[in-house]
Amino acid sequence: LLERAKFKEITMYDHIGLKVKSLDASVRFYTAALAPLGYVLSSRDDSGAGFGPKGEPALWLYAHKGPAAEGAHIAFRAPDHAAIRKFHSEGVKAGGRDNGGAGPRADYSPTYFAAFLIDPDGNNVEAVCT
């Protein structure tokens, strides 16, 4: 079992970068899905875009002409269950595919609540609160 404490203590990452096939489609998806979690588009040009809390990018999307690297799993912290539900609904409206609706995941931990989406490039994107 994954213990709740493990999720609160992870601070080893400064940022994550993903190659994307369509920057416009990815920006549309991440703008909609991450807004309920408090993450905003903070940087954008023809080569990429950055998202993060308070305008400090922690997720970078890089426009890439070749195949994107699909299959990554990224989990974003959410403030509450309502934000996770909105992450899922807004993400689906913006082109994401359902990969697990908002709800408890008791097999992860007794307090784990999450939703999962597949982004336009095939990555598994999660919103979670514990």
Spans of features found by a protein language model:
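Long, contiguous binding/interaction regions
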Residues: 40-44, 72, 82, 94, ...
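Leucine-biased recognition of intrinsically disordered, low-complexity hydrophobic segments
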Residues: 1-2
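Conserved beta-strand in the GNAT
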Residues: 58-62, 116, 125-129
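Vicinal oxygen chelate
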Residues: 22-24, 76-121
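N-terminal beta-strand motif that seeds the catalytic metal site of vicinal oxygen chelate
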Residues: 6-27, 74
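Long, continuous compositionally biased terminal/linker segments
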Residues: 52-93
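Core segments of cupin and vicinal oxygen chelate
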Residues: 18-58
